[in-house]
């Protein structure tokens, strides 16, 4: 007999919008009372919202798993309840793994209890960050903001995707929680999109005051991907008010973005001013020596000593970003382990063949050509004013690749596609966001990017 709620969750994950699932279904825990299914929400607000808006979807999912619709109730975890018992289904129906405990479900909607250092899963630390000329300033600033002697209350980290912004924000959060003399350090970490989603939920539920209290009564606010706020005036107003309130109390605010403040458009001038009011640290692409050191450190974490020649080869050929460097290394280590062989230069060359080689360059013409081929559209359609969904996705993917692989400025990229540079920024932000989602569209975008990067490179003599 195995837990059925995980299988019901899996069905709901497939049927619901990813954001809806993450905010409202994922926090629920299941209990069995006879033939009834009891869902426990983190608080009364979530329980009420799920009852009013998602009960039909839950009943359909339960019926598809159990064969019939059980009696389903949704209650608040703040109410007294009997000891829970797992919901059971026959063992031949094998669901996905069960959800983690409530303590591990960070960032629940409008769950305002103070959070301890253990309630946020910090994935990275300063000790694991490889420092080089390209990121030295950002690393030092991130460390210093954890100290009382740091004179600024704001830090803005800017870089292309995959160069370490998230790593540093996690490291700051972990460090502050570790050195805090509080039992429950008040730290909030979320993306600008998550902030906006929770604000919308609070507005609909008339819980704005509680929302404000949550984010204005912290010691540190770590807000990622603030370029998402472009063109969203209501969200900008709330972020601005939150930042003002935090700074007036001496709290610290860290922002990250794929764009520098000067490149952000459709943004309130006061908010831009707040972004620029503290220290701005830009992370550039890592140098050869930094890339090599990253490879050594990551190999060490896997208890592998990387041969010097192999490290040189990988560092010299994989230059796009740190994520790609780490991915290449993981594939190399996995291949050696599966084949039960030593890591060799030949094996490394085979793995590099799936990534960008040093002499292979992806220029704007190749990007346009491959995008048109992959999306089955003409160059004229790609550069047209049409807002058809598939054309917008293709165009935004081209923006993303042009910024990643060429030296063209945002304005120059825009001119190539008859667009303003503000449109280019929004398009790139949308693609980055979709690539981080486990959705059909997200997978389509990732596949398109990989296809262009694999097929579109031209070899220079």
Curated annotation (Swiss-Prot):
This is Chromosomal replication initiator protein DnaA. Keywords: ATP-binding, Cytoplasm, DNA replication, DNA-binding, Lipid-binding, Nucleotide-binding. GO terms for molecular function: ATP binding; ATP hydrolysis activity; DNA replication origin binding; lipid binding. SMART domains: AAA (SM00382), Bac_DnaA_C (SM00760). Residues 1-68 are annotated as: Domain I, interacts with DnaA modulators. It comes from Oleidesulfovibrio alaskensis (strain ATCC BAA-1058 / DSM 17464 / G20) (Desulfovibrio alaskensis). Residues 68-118 are annotated as: Domain II. Oligomerizes as a right-handed, spiral filament on DNA at oriC. Its main location: cytoplasm. PANTHER family: CHROMOSOMAL REPLICATION INITIATOR PROTEIN DNAA (PTHR30050:SF2). Domain I is involved in oligomerization and binding regulators, domain II is flexibile and of varying length in different bacteria, domain III forms the AAA+ region, while domain IV binds dsDNA. ATP binds at residues 162, 164-166. Residues 119-336 are annotated as: Domain III, AAA+ region. InterPro entries: AAA+_ATPase (IPR003593), Chromosome_initiator_DnaA (IPR001957), Chromosome_initiator_DnaA-like (IPR020591), Chromosome_initiator_DnaA_CS (IPR018312), DnaA_C (IPR013159), DnaA_dom (IPR013317), DnaA_N_dom (IPR024633), DnaA_N_sf (IPR038454). The keyword Cell membrane does not apply. NCBIfam families: DnaA. It is found in: Cytoplasm. Gene3D superfamilies: 1.10.1750.10, 1.10.8.60, 3.30.300.180, P-loop containing nucleotide triphosphate hydrolases (3.40.50.300). Belongs to the DnaA family. GO terms for biological process: DNA replication initiation; regulation of DNA replication.
